[in-house]
From Swiss-Prot:
SUPFAM superfamilies: P-loop containing nucleoside triphosphate hydrolases
Organism: Idiomarina loihiensis (strain ATCC BAA-735 / DSM 15497 / L2-TR)
Single GO biological process annotation from the record: phosphate ion transmembrane transport
Binding-site list for ATP: G58, P59, S60, G61, C62, G63, K64, S65
Protein name per the record: Phosphate import ATP-binding protein PstB
Amino acid sequence: MISVNPSTSNLEKLDLHNLPAEQTALDIKNLDLYYGEDQALYDISMRIPNNRVTAFIGPSGCGKSTLLRCINRMNDLVEICRIEGQIDMHGHNIYGKNVDVASLRRRVGMVFQRPNPFPKSIYENVVYGLRLQGVKDKRVLDEAVETSLRGAALWDEVKDRLNASAFSLSGGQQQRLVIARSIAIEPEILLLDEPTSALDPISTLTIEELITDLKDKYTVVIVTHNMQQAARVSDQTAFLYMGKLIEYADTDTLFTTPSEKQTEDYITGRYG
């Protein structure tokens, strides 16, 4: 049996299928995705609540990361990719005709599997996005660096060496730096694509504790191949299989009393 973090199971239960608009960060409606003639996602519909951690789980190739990348339109970069359906972010379709994709990606931060700091100092990594936005005031930048590094639980470890190369940090520290860089531009939503898969157990635990803290300010969506991790950090979990959303429920419900046999088979290790 997979144990669920008590802090998540004690949260108010939400009716995920009838979530009020004011509690909904993302409303995914009848989403289909194709790579050329091959369909990768099939009629995905789900509502992701504000200021909660939502996990996408499922076997390799099930569509977890593909769905995640729809949320900030990273799939636009794939020439043969075509999307039908829509995703509303706080009531506005992010696939609408007049959407500024660059602006959308400022509102939706993303952290990938492997830490990808820029070849710059720790300080310059954090302020990179702010500089792109035209922020030049050193006081504003300094405050953003401290606030973001504190938010990523890294400030105390690097405050005396902000001008050191980001590459001088450990893997776990680099991943927290990337998170700090993402939150420096104050996104509304933070996407994490298997953020601990390349890290050691101690660094993984630090990131997991950070994820739990981040939901105080952000809506967090995490893709993970690790079911135990999903149970530890998430409030809701969506199980995908072969591009289809099989089940979406509060994490403790999905892991203890799943309603679909496919879900039960997966979490008990019968396949996947």
